[in-house]
Amino acid sequence: MSRVGKQLIIIPSGVTVKIEGQKVSVKGPKGDLEKTFHSNTVIVLNGREISVSVKSPEEGFDRGLWGLSRVLISNMIKGVTEGFSKKLEIAGIGFKAQVQGNKLVLSLGFSHPVKLEFPKNISAVVEKNLITISGIDKEQVGQFAATVKLLKKPEPYKGKGIKYQGEIIRRKAGKAAKAAEGK
């Protein structure tokens, strides 16, 4: 039995949930989300509680779906009430970011500025060297943050690049430090 999947999801006030077969729609103060789940999951709405189960819990694939489906629905509810955000730090001389309309424009040492268009329901705020990406869909927020980070991964010698706030970059000693150490 799935430890995560068997827990009930309590729906907070101000949030409406509609279940039509395998399709779950969640509407809240920050927006609305919709997701279709696998045919082996059974989602039941009882008043202000949602219970998730699977057709055959003894199979490994279904057990995996059980906990996943419950967490995805829980994240949908949290997204429309509180929202999600990821913070990225930019380190490097001349590296900067700015928001222009619905695009994030990054100067990362390339010959041209990199322009990324925000997906639906995603926004960003730039303060000095910190980019805060926020939205109601946890998957989209994480994916967009990962896309931005991939543009300039932190290098191990000086730590220049884009990293998540609080992420620790393993640093390497340069040639000069390594040569002095060997003598």
Map each language-model feature to its residues.
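N-terminal intrinsically disordered, cationic/polar leader segments
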Residues: 2-146, 150-183
